[in-house]
A protein has these predicted regions:
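Short, conserved catalytic-motif segment at the N-terminal edge
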Residues: 35, 41-108, 128-130, 144-152, ...
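Short, well-ordered beta-strand elements
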Residues: 244, 395-397, 403-412
Length: 431
């Protein structure tokens, strides 16, 4: 069952004063969420969207819930600065049959990464670092990296895209042609811990229970690179962007968790976004089927920019709406419009591969995938739209052309549900 919420202060919904009752299936109870400032709301038709067509989001989510592929979801859409859709679907806890709630807290996994992208570009704007800076400028251990190549042929340096980690092929090491840069890490073109030959032959550093970015990131320099820096796109899921987070700490003089809280979460009113979910909020976490150990995890001191956050649909809608607004929300300018374009522009030509295949029509910016040609890419998003997702199924994106922000919160990575949500959002645009 899907529920459209009427919430005081927008805990994630469309305000009653802005929506005709006939347009809504209203559920109770009304939830009071304290927010520094509510996201504005509107009737979909007032911002060029169709109420009837937006209901297809609910139909699509329910279909995937009925199939057993997802347990539930929260979906949110804003256009032209106004929230037009915020809906809960399915169950927050399957075993207890607890319905999904508007303020449910989800594990964001790699949906954390665009937060780092914004944090880094804040320091670029302040002149404290440059994307083309070598990593060794801040962390000297990365000064002289090596690249793994196949042993044969001897007259060519070939770095395979993927290898069997348990039985890597015969290989040799060659010096990196140049140092890896912040740009390389933000675009996943560094070759650091990205699943190739170098990763297979490298010993993963052991992380202690009291590890921090400061203690762990220098150890990453022990990795052998998977390919020459800048020559390929290959996703570094858990290492590369943590290096950038450590640079943010060094340059700003502030721990990464405090930096993003003070500079991003607090100004945007993202009050439910945490590396460690506070005790009084743990009951709001989605109970993921077959992953009950999430609730038993001890607090961490390792604030991973690659995948450490938990958050809500409303909080991520605030983040995406800031990007739609050219770096501004509630009169608070986090980035300039030009810098937002830097974040969401393709920096790689045709290097982007989308994990397992060439992704024609797509590119990659700073921590986000970018639609270049939606027809060629088979994407329902507009040219210029950018965003990213997480391993548990979360997705969010910004569409500057349509002035649209969309958030899908899942805890099962099911691509048909992700596609159907994006399709339902785009087909609801009528002006």
């Amino acid at each position: 069952m899907s529920r459209i919420w009427l919430l005081v202060g927008l805990g994630g919904a469309v305000a009653a004063s802005a929506v005709e009752q006939d347009d809504l299936l209203v559920s109770s109870p009304v939830i009071q969420l304290e927010r520094p400032q509510a996201l504005p709301t509107a009737r979909p038709e007032d911002v060029g969207m169709s109420s009837q067509r937006l209901r297809r989001i609910s139909t699509a989510m329910q279909r995937h819930i009925d199939s057993g592929r997802i347990q539930g979801a929260v979906t949110a859409v804003a256009r032209r600065g106004k929230v037009v859709h915020f809906e809960t679907h399915g169950l927050m806890d399957v075993d207890s049959h607890r319905a999904m709630e508007a303020d449910a807290i989800f594990r964001m996994a790699s949906s954390t990464k665009p937060i780092l992208g914004v944090a880094t570009l804040m320091l670029v704007e302040e002149g404290l670092l440059r994307p083309r800076d070598p990593v060794s400028k801040y962390i000297p251990e990365f000064k002289a990296m090596q690249v793994a190549v196949l042993n044969e042929p001897q007259d060519q340096d070939i770095s395979p895209v993927r290898v069997n980690r348990r039985d890597p092929p015969a290989h040799r090491l060659v010096p990196a042609n140049r140092e890896i840069t912040i740009h390389d890490l933000l675009t996943h073109t560094s070759g650091l811990a990205s699943g190739g030959l170098g990763s297979a032959i490298s010993k993963r550093p052991r992380r202690d229970s009291n590890a921090t970015l400061a203690t762990e990131v220098p150890k990453y320099a022990q990795y052998v690179l998977d390919f020459q820096p800048g020559s390929r796109w290959s996703y570094s899921p858990g290492v590369g962007l943590n290096v950038v987070a450590r640079i943010v700490e060094i340059v700003s003089g502030t721990a990464f968790n405090h930096f993003v809280h003070d500079r991003i979460f607090e100004p945007l009113g993202m009050q439910d976004t945490h590396f460690n979910v506070p005790d009084h909020k743990t009951s709001r976490r989605v109970v993921i089927r077959n992953r009950s150990n999430w609730s038993r995890r001890p607090p961490t001191t390792f604030f991973s920019a690659s995948g450490g956050l938990s958050s809500t649909a409303e909080d991520y809608l605030r983040f995406e709406q800031m990007l739609v607004g050219g770096g501004q929300l509630f009169g608070r300018q986090l980035l300039s419009p030009r810098t937002v374009r830097m974040l969401g522009s393709n920096h790689l030509g045709d290097l982007y591969r989308s994990f397992s295949r060439n992704q024609n029509g797509m590119g990659y910016g700073y921590t986000v995938a970018v639609v270049i040609d939606p027809i060629i890419a088979g994407s329902r998003r507009s040219a210029g739209a950018f965003g990213w997702g997480g391993a548990f199924g979360t997705q969010s994106w910004t569409d500057p052309v349509e002035q649209l922000a969309a958030v899908l919160m899942l805890q099962q990575p099911y691509s048909p549900a992700q596609y159907d949500f994006g399709n339902a959002v785009q087909q609801a645009i009528i002006d």
